[in-house]
Amino acid sequence: MSRETIVGREAGTSAALLCAACVAVAGCLGSGADDEPRVIEGDTATIYSSVPRHGVSASTAAEVVAGERRALEERGRRAGGLRIRFRRLPATDARDKAWDPALVAENAHRAADDPAAIAYLGELDYGATAVSLPITNDAGLLQVSPGDGLTSLTQRPPGRPRSGPERYYPTDRRTFVRIGPTDLDEADRLVARLTSADDTKFGLVFDREIYGRELAAQVVERARRAGLTAVASEEYRGQVADIPDIARALADEEPDAVVQLGVAGRGTIPMLVAIDDELPGVPLLASSGILALPQLALPAGPSRIEAFGPALPPEQAGYEAMRLVLDAVAEGGRNRRRVVAAALRLSRRLPEDRVALYRPDAHGRFAKVRR
């Protein structure tokens, strides 16, 4: 599969999926944030948290929520003269999904329709915010994501001029802050690693979800600018039986390195083992999706893999997300628009470099490499 195929058909398909989600959401939106209540009445405000209860991100979600609760308890459950009520909402009910679009939309609508809502924490990862953000933005509600890296939420992805963030903001006002890195940040680090190792030809394997497809397009575009070439790209569609053919197709192009882009699942270890069998010793790189399963233990062969992911551990990311919201409420009080303005200003305190390097430890489990 050529570079043009990734950037064109694959990325175009993911864009279509995102647009379809946004169109479906748009049909449920009201007439805009100006029609919504702007000021919290009474002495209690609600912060909603949308996270998976099942699936690959469930354990990460539990840590994120623990961090959110810790930050809230440290403030005595109060901010801006308000008592803060915390509501956790499930973003998935299926064990084989990272997130469920219908549930994410339902969560966002519940928060947007609540006159006592002051902020929405979500989504956790892998592009789910593309569904919830238009809804919360239409209500003028602050949304803070602990970990969703979808680049187009805040900037135009390279090579995709029609995929900018404006489609997520029906009010034409930004109401979103993210705590972790963008997928483009990860793409830049992956390409920098390839460049530093003089791996001018590389292969890609990515999953069929929005996360993998969009990230693949960004890696290819950034690599092209750096003078590198994607000599092979293979889409993994969740069928373990297809893995040997994918590994052989990658090996046929004799890449200097292979980059794995996708969310960890039952095919992750078989895929890495198959690639190692076909390309023994060839450098392996991965994005943060491979970190989704903390219990993942790699065998000796592919344990040379390096991954780039969020610098903050999940519990700390949840803590920082809630802390930012509470600080914004302390400044903005009962007024949603003032809370949003405060959060956008306070987000400048977040570190610019939010990406860390991960390598498998002696047990084959990924651990952050200390600088």
Short names for language-model regions:
Residues 36-69, 79, 89-99, 208, ...:
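Extracytoplasmic "Venus flytrap"
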Residues 2-18:
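Bacterial N-terminal signal peptides that target proteins for export
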Residues 268-320, 330-333, 365-368:
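Extracellular/periplasmic periplasmic-binding protein-like sensory domains
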Residues 29-32:
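Bacterial signal peptide processing site
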Residues 35, 59-63, 78-162, 236-241, ...:
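Beta-alpha junction/loop-to-helix N-cap segments that form part of ligand/metal-binding clefts
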Residues 117-232, 282-306:
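Extracytoplasmic ligand/sensor domains, especially the bilobed periplasmic-binding protein
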Residues 315-370:
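Segments of small-molecule ligand-sensing domains
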Residues 25-27:
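C-terminal motif of bacterial Sec signal peptides marking the signal peptidase cleavage site
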